[in-house]
Curated annotation (Swiss-Prot):
Binds 1 Mg(2+) ion per subunit. It comes from Chlorobium phaeobacteroides (strain DSM 266 / SMG 266 / 2430). Substrate binds at residues 36, 60, 82, 147. This is Shikimate kinase. Keywords: Amino-acid biosynthesis, Aromatic amino acid biosynthesis, ATP-binding, Cytoplasm, Kinase, Magnesium, Metal-binding, Nucleotide-binding, Transferase. CDD domains: SK.
Length: 190
C-alpha cells in the first residue's frame, strides 16, 4: 500500500537531500532518516569504506535491506543515496510504498558542491585518487545521464541549484501538501 506520508528524496550526491531532508521533515512534522547514515550506523563503516572494502554491489544490497526496514513507516522523510534508484528492487519498492521527490541540480552546480569532497566513492579515480574538476564534472554528467530517467519519474521535482534552502523547503512543503490534497482529499501531508 502506498503511504502518502512516506516521502523519499532522490537526486545526485550534492543536490541537497541531507540538508533539505531534516528541514522538510520539521516543516511537515515528520521524522527523518538519511539512508546512507543508517547504513553507516548499522555497519560501523563509512559508505566510502564499504565501497572500498566490499564493492558497490555489496553496498546496494545493504541499501535495499535498510530501505525495506523503513517502508512500513508513515510520516517519514527518507534521504536516499544518489544511486539508490539504479537498483530495480529499490526503485520498485520506493514507487510502491511512498512518494518520490527529486531534488534536481545541474552538473555545474554539483561539480562546485562536490569538487572538494573526498568522501564520495563514485567520484574517485579507478585507483581511488582525487579527480580534477573537469573529470568530476564529466563523471557527474555520465552518472546523471544514466540515473536521470529514474530521477525524472518522481512525483514532485524541485530545482535545488537556484534559490535558498529555506525557500526550497517552503516550495517542497507546498508541493507535497498540494499533492496529498489532490490524491487523498486531506488538507495537509499529516
Amino acid at each position: 500500500m502506498k503511504h502518502h506520508s512516506l516521502i523519499f528524496l532522490t537526486g545526485f550526491s550534492g543536490s541537497g537531500k541531507s540538508t533539505i531532508g531534516p528541514l522538510l521533515a520539521n516543516s511537515l512534522g515528520y521524522d527523518f532518516i538519511d539512508l546512507d547514515q543508517a547504513i553507516e550506523a548499522i555497519t560501523g563503516k563509512s559508505v566510502s569504506r564499504i565501497f572500498a572494502e566490499e564493492g558497490e554491489s555489496y553496498f546496494r544490497k545493504l541499501e535495499l535491506d535498510t530501505l525495506k526496514t523503513v517502508t512500513n513507516r508513515e510520516e517519514l522523510i527518507v534521504s536516499l543515496g544518489g544511486g539508490a534508484l539504479e537498483s530495480n528492487e529499490c526503485y520498485t519498492l520506493i514507487k510502491e510504498k511512498g512518494t518520490l521527490v527529486y531534488l534536481k541540480s545541474g552538473s555545474g552546480t554539483l561539480t562546485k558542491r562536490l569538487c572538494h569532497k573526498t568522501d564520495r566513492p563514485l567520484l574517485k579515480s579507478e585507483q581511488g585518487g582525487k579527480l580534477s574538476n573537469g573529470e568530476i564534472e564529466q563523471k557527474i554528467r555520465e552518472l546523471l545521464a544514466r540515473r536521470e530517467p529514474r530521477y525524472n519519474s518522481a512525483t514532485i521535482t524541485v530545482q535545488t541549484d537556484t534559490g535558498r534552502i529555506g525557500s526550497t523547503v517552503e516550495e517542497l512543503t507546498r508541493k507535497i501538501n498540494r499533492y496529498v490534497r489532490k490524491t487523498t482529499g486531506n488538507s495537509r501531508a499529516k
